[in-house]
């Protein structure tokens, strides 16, 4: 019965992809171990190569045992297993969020190397209920309260085929088939708000969780049927994103959309332009929406971005000064800099560094820069935007600023594209 439910889910979620490969994230807990066995049956039935991935966060001694166990299962199932390691660098600030981001970075990068398009994760019905309660507690809007069984990360499709299966069914499946799993002791700690909510829900009657699930489904339906199409339409109609890493929002077109969608558009642009992975809080977006409604020009900094109104348009570009991007050595053919730009070299060069333009360097090359095109596109905000662009240096000398076709020598040839590592449950643009 459980497998039939799983099979129906995954076939609907995968659709007509015509997959020959698929990957699965396994931690050693009951949820992911059950998913592994279910996915293995499905993969065998459909002649699909299954890759098993685990990530050691190097925080618990037990994780080594879990990884050995997953490797043992993988060997028995004759599946390829990859054990990845997350380096927390002894920085325990905001660790849960950083570990999650690091985990997905590692897994999706491996998927790209393996030419795998889909990664399965073991989020089940109880997880969705807990998430809904957590977000409700944080006063999330309707987009925040919604959940998705499919989303994208690093151009890999993340699929959750256990979304309507309670944890109790997964545990029962493992017990019936005498399959071992590990309990993560951190799930018992009241240090995490999720665990407290989980314990409260455990004490409630089943109908309470059922009612929450119904509300979740209603929210999801509203998003899918009405608000998500409106959001995609709004982005297409009102937003212009430029290769220089800034954007203009047409406020006349923006005004016709619902408030929920307006919040999401601003959030969408702030994440993309800032290069950050986290969303802006509603309390930081609300004042911007209020200023927009007042029809006055303004200039504000929010979420690592400068937002300025110019008549009926909103210009958003990256804020520089407080948090400068790290320099990167261009060792391979291409590199991502500032989580926003992809720089590619088209010739062999000595080790060069991708960094930002300093005032000292600007003074040296100022008279050689042609900023007319950038000036026209950005409504005379070219000087501020120039300092947000990647430059290429060799031995402390600026040899190229590809965006404005500045090269100190004809032998250099670099390509640059605006390619933010943008993550959204509602939109995806490759």
Curated annotation (Swiss-Prot):
NCBIfam families: lysidine_TilS_N. This is tRNA(Ile)-lysidine synthase. Pfam families: ATP_bind_3. Its EC number is 6.3.4.19. It is an enzyme of class 6 (ligase). The N-terminal region contains the highly conserved SGGXDS motif, predicted to be a P-loop motif involved in ATP binding. It comes from Rickettsia typhi (strain ATCC VR-144 / Wilmington). Disulfide bonds: none annotated. It catalyses: cytidine(34) in tRNA(Ile2) + L-lysine + ATP = lysidine(34) in tRNA(Ile2) + AMP + diphosphate + H(+). Keywords: ATP-binding, Cytoplasm, Ligase, Nucleotide-binding, tRNA processing.
